[in-house]
Amino acid sequence: MFKGSIVALITPMDIKGNICKKSLKKLVKYHIKNKTNAIISVGTTGESATLNKNEHTNVIMHTLEYADEKIPIIAGTGSNATSESILLTKKLELSGISGCLNITPYYNKPTQEGLYLHFKSISESTDLPQILYNVPHRTGCDLLPQTIAKLAKFKNIIGLKDASGDLSRVNQIKSLVNKNFILISGDDTTALDFIQLGGNGVISVTANIAARHISKICKLALAGNFYKARKINEKLKILHNLLFKETNPIPIKWAAKYIGLIETDKIRLPMTQLLDKNKKNLKKIINLLQLNKNKFL
């Protein structure tokens, strides 16, 4: 169902820190124009942790409105409280979203049995397609391949976003799940290798400002043309790394503002503005790639 370049969309804000609908609309149109395959609305990159419940829902609904059924919208509905995740999922059931991205519960560090029961409960509460999301370095818990295999038996748990950084897991998980289970990289720096090992695409931070590049890389890679895909990807390596010099989404919001996609790089505390030295380096690579001119290399 989902493959290729899926953007982990930033949530633009105005100078007062309120949601900027004008910039959000511009972002959505940018991804439609540049052939992004789907949008993640209000995931980690979308600052889900610092949006209140009404804002969370409103951003998703506005994203759907601006997408106008021209691009699938996947809603970030994860929580470290199972009941909260179920509540948000059910609230969005008739909204028109194409699926949900569910992060592993953060901070409370559940056991593998707890993780299994958490995702099982969410799955059984809805018919919406569910994508599991494993990002151990941010959550403090790791969804292991054996647990993923158990969860893959639920018909609406259709895939996994793997941001573990462990490429050896791709084949391990593939050997444990059915052939239709989707494996999506959550790490721009290793995404091409992930696809070459049998993955289906990437949920990308870099795509926020280099949508056509990431789309082309994924299209080539999924067609088996890794030589051409690597030629493009090599040009983005420095950019990938610079976008994670500080905690995501600090650098990507500044970069999106720099190239004119959003009006401000406002970000909510406890996240802070990008350091000047990192702005300088990002500006240099953005100019080199001509992303500020919206050109495709």
UniProtKB/Swiss-Prot annotation:
The keyword Membrane does not apply. Signal peptide: none annotated. It holds the Pfam family DHDPS. Keywords: Amino-acid biosynthesis, Cytoplasm, Diaminopimelate biosynthesis, Lyase, Lysine biosynthesis, Schiff base. The active site is at Y133 (proton donor/acceptor), K161 (schiff-base intermediate with substrate). One of its GO terms (biological process) is diaminopimelate biosynthetic process. CDD domains: DHDPS. PROSITE patterns: DHDPS_1 (PS00665), DHDPS_2 (PS00666). It catalyses: L-aspartate 4-semialdehyde + pyruvate = (2S,4S)-4-hydroxy-2,3,4,5-tetrahydrodipicolinate + H2O + H(+). This is 4-hydroxy-tetrahydrodipicolinate synthase. It comes from Buchnera aphidicola subsp. Cinara cedri (strain Cc).
